[in-house]
Amino acid sequence: MRTISAIGIFAIAVAPAFAQAPTTAQARDMAATCANCHGTNGVSAGGTDSLAGVPKAETARKMREYKAGNRPSTVMQQLAKGFTDEQIDAMAAWFAAQPAK
């Protein structure tokens, strides 16, 4: 019984190491949650920054700063906490690939 429990605990502990990065379609779907403030496909109509065409590293850095509480915000800190670093990278790459307008 201990062996089975140990195997189960080990499997749970290492599972994140085998998780795959989000696909482009998954990144697009996650990025859609940003549309209310940042516009469709990251093209803002005003009031917030556009994300379309922004370099991946810049968007990912800002999201991680929000997530860590190191960047002031009323909403973004809570939203960013809901994403893993891999998801943040995938969304940042997706926004970077969108044409800026």
Where are these regions (language model features)?
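Cleavable N-terminal signal peptides
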Residues: 6-7, 17
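Sec-dependent bacterial lipoprotein signal peptides
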Residues: 8-12
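Electrostatic cytochrome c docking/interface patches
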Residues: 13-31, 49, 60, 65, ...
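Residue-level hotspots at or immediately adjacent to binding/recognition sites across diverse folds
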Residues: 20, 40, 79, 94-96
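The canonical Cys-X-X-Cys-His
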Residues: 32-40, 91
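Gly/Gly-Pro-rich "capping" loops immediately C-terminal to redox-active cysteine motifs
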Residues: 41-71, 77-83
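C-terminal capping alpha-helices of c-type cytochrome domains
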Residues: 71, 81-101
